[in-house]
Amino acid sequence: TSVVAAGMSYLIVPLLGDLNLTQDEAINALVIPGIGGLLLVFVAGVLGARFGERRTLGVAASTYFAGALLVAIAPDISLVTLGLLIVSCSGITLSIVSLSLLNSRISEPAQRATAFATLGVVAPAVFIAMPVLSGALTQFASWRWIPVLWAVLAVFVVLATIVFLRPVDRPSKRQEFVSPILAGLFLAAILQVLNNWPAGGLSSVRVWIPLAVACAAFVGFIYARNRVASPSLTLAPLRSRATTPLLIVAVLFPLANVFFYITMG
């Protein structure tokens, strides 16, 4: 996921010329995958718990591979957007299930600290290295080699999942998917409200429709949680003091790409 986020900036300018797009069309093609990722952000954790982390990681990495190849060979912006949507959704799943895997399989405090510290080193390293590599690629080759690089990395993830992760027998536990789906829909709708607000505020159809969807999703989420004894999505971690610095750190790295879009404007 960090690889895509770090290298995405270098797709915009080549896309404009290769597919004869306007700048707004290229930006929209990058916004839609983010919305799709938000829809799955809570469902991904439930998938790992329901089907097992090993199987979920393998399927997500394979789907990521297919999406990256679709971006690489896409002849028009609609297929590029579809490929980026697949990459975004499967990448979100990979990230969340990987964190869940670390948390469930490493119980020793010292080992867990080392594992999460290593994971914390990877993100800034990728955000430093990938823009340089992506920029170098676009200097002498087509932008389509960037998603090919994503596909190659997905192959390594599939192989690592098969080789290093052993299947774990767990008692089958029924998971409800309604509340995670509605929570993701709420986040995606709120993002659309914020994204379209400059177009005219509440007087704009592009604002009040997603706002209505967000309200309906929120009401449905509360109703779904109250209907089941053990909902799949819990808000308990948000009450922990340790959550705040983690959320701040998670936001800092993607903000690096904001400077690129500022220069585009």
Per-range role (PLM):
Residues 34, 41-177:
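Helix-loop-helix hairpins in multi-pass membrane proteins, especially solute transporters
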Residues 22-25, 48, 112-115, 120, ...:
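A short alpha-helix capping/helix-coil boundary motif
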Residues 13-15, 31-36, 52-54, 85, ...:
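Short charge-dense sequence patches
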Residues 1-33, 37-45, 54-57, 61-62, ...:
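12-transmembrane solute porter fold
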Residues 22-25, 79, 112, 171, ...:
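Membrane-interfacial loop-to-transmembrane-helix junctions in polytopic alpha-helical membrane proteins
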Residues 5, 26-27, 81, 116, ...:
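Generic signal for short, ordered secondary-structure residues
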Residues 117, 135, 139-250:
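Hydrophobic transmembrane-helix bundles of small-molecule transporters
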Residues 4-14, 66-76, 124-139, 162, ...:
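Membrane-embedded alpha-helical segments in integral membrane proteins
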